Amino acid sequence: MPPNPTGPTNSQLRMLARFLRKAARANSASIWRVVAEFVEKPRRQRVIVNVGKLNRVAKEGDVVVVPGKLLAGGQLNKKIIVAAVKISPKAARKVIEAGGEVLTIPELVRKYPRGSGVRIVI
């Protein structure tokens, strides 16, 4: 291992990135490759999104992937499907209370293998 690793040393994140790259190749869906690139970033550059931002950028019924952590800041009043690397319990509760659905990223890839209609929020 190099003296200063610049990617994830977390084995689960590395496996997730590998899974996303394989899904991108198998399904000819470049969205999963882009998500893998975000997942592989160093810790200081990882994505953190609040629920309030989802409320601003997503439309009713959207499918959204957050290639990082989803936190509970703000309000959500739209029914959306959200997948993220990590989701705080309060954020998950807010999404579910708004009528949405919370998935893991692998579940989202299996549900939408081509990535059609999936939006990346960073």
UniProtKB/Swiss-Prot annotation:
GO terms for molecular function: RNA binding; structural constituent of ribosome. Keywords: Ribonucleoprotein, Ribosomal protein. InterPro entries: Ribosomal_eL18, Ribosomal_eL18_arc, Ribosomal_uL15/eL18, Ribosomal_uL15/eL18_sf, Ribosomal_uL15_CS. GO terms for biological process: translation. GO terms for cellular component: cytosolic large ribosomal subunit. It comes from the Archaea. Belongs to the eukaryotic ribosomal protein eL18 family. This is Large ribosomal subunit protein eL18. The gene is rpl18e.
